[in-house]
Amino acid sequence: MAEPLWSDSAITLSPSMLLVPASSELYDIDCNALHEGMRRTRVLYDFVRAAEDDNGADYCILDCPPGYTVASVNALFACDEVIVPAKIDGFVFDGLESVRAQIRSLRRARPDVRIAGVLVTMRNSSEVVREGETLLRQRGIPVFEQVIRRTDKVVETTFEKKPLIDYCPRSVATQDYRRWVAEYLGEELGHGEV
């Protein structure tokens, strides 16, 4: 069986944007890297640079689970910015501290990697979530103004295996993601562009 490669998992979203989604193939890459004694931390870095150079990609989105896996370390090593999606709950602060610790541990090799911001997801309007979000914003970590509201439509897309924008283009989460992308890119959305 051929060795899985990062490029095998890449999905072209547009001519200038690639997505490497979290998948079981990334687990296989993790296992292969462990067998090789962790010498492979530059594999994803090299893939991202090749995508930029060969394909003219402006953005490579690397979706990986939190934790100290080879895939996560590879993703942090390869990126310039980290966007941390976070559901406001009792675990969010520990998770953010873990991401910050991982980034600090890579500083010598990649001093410019930074947290672009925390993207609050699955947000509802309960008092405990509002209080947690306030605490998060007081932590000194950048937090995007735009939040992604909770809706069952997001869950439905996982069963349908369709992107949210195709499955339900008018859902509140779709609108929120569009606004967040505009915020991240520093763009202004005109009326009716959501």
What are the language-model segments listed below?
Residues M1-V194:
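P-loop NTP-binding core
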